[in-house]
Design a protein with these regions (language model features):
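Short, flexible segments with low predicted structural confidence
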Residues: 2-4, 18, 35-36
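An amphipathic, aromatic/His-enriched active-site/gating alpha helix that lines ligand/cofactor pockets
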Residues: 26-38, 57-92
């Protein structure tokens, strides 16, 4: 069964990469038990720590969309928005076929 994937980069204002990464890691903890969450990774560029990447895998797009209703998630989004260097770009939406590290795919 295919899954819904989302992969995107967030560019933050100078020096705020670590702070945004911490906010996103907290978001990953909140959604880790949400229905359909298979993977929520937060990464930083080695050469540019103010570029933060998020990779998500969900059972469905609906599960991803519903994760925004998890208590605390909207508050974290509100904390993150002022750190961004502009409006976030739309991430890449992917059909995840499977692979190492994704159980039950």
């Amino acid at each position: 069964m295919n899954r819904y994937g989302l992969h995107g980069k967030l560019q933050v204002t100078a020096g705020n990469g670590p702070q945004l990464a911490q906010i996103l890691l907290e978001a990953s903890r909140l959604v880790s038990t949400a229905k359909g969450c298979r993977l929520y990774l937060v990464s930083q560029e080695d050469t540019s720590p103010d570029e933060v990447w998020v990779t998500e895998v969900w059972d469905s797009k609906e599960d991803h969309d519903n994760s925004l209703q998890v208590p605390g998630v909207k508050e974290l989004i509100s904390q993150a928005m002022p750190l961004l260097a502009g409006r976030p770009e739309k991430g890449q939406e992917l059909t995840v076929l499977g692979g190492a590290g994704l159980s039950n795919l």
